[in-house]
Amino acid sequence: METGSSDDDLYKDDPSHPIPYVFNCDIEAVLKDGGADLSIVIASPLGSDTRSLKRLLKKIETYLQFICSEGFRTESGIPTAENTRIVVHIHKKSDPAILRALSQCHEWVVDNNAKLVVEYL
């Protein structure tokens, strides 16, 4: 008997979670001179539980996959860390462990031709 939840359960749509839709882009702003700002909006406090952390990392990974796609290049041009940002708008009362985890994602994002920016709501 399996005791853990499957990835399908972990990442399924959950409107009650601070990251309700892991595989959807919350906001995309294509820039006039190329590139884009892709925003993740976390409007309620995000805890440091394993599920929340995994949902956040999967959402960033989903954005990075989009940035590396042909569809992104068609819409926004060639992505670079100078013209393409993932902006995490996070509730100011989110667990500090989440902010530490985000600080460790900068190199991962840069390696995938974008810049990670964290802003408080």
Language-model segments: residues:
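Extended, well-folded catalytic/binding cores that form a central cleft or groove in large enzyme
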Residues: G35, S48, R55, K59, ...
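N-terminal, charge-rich interaction modules
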Residues: E2-G4, D8-A43
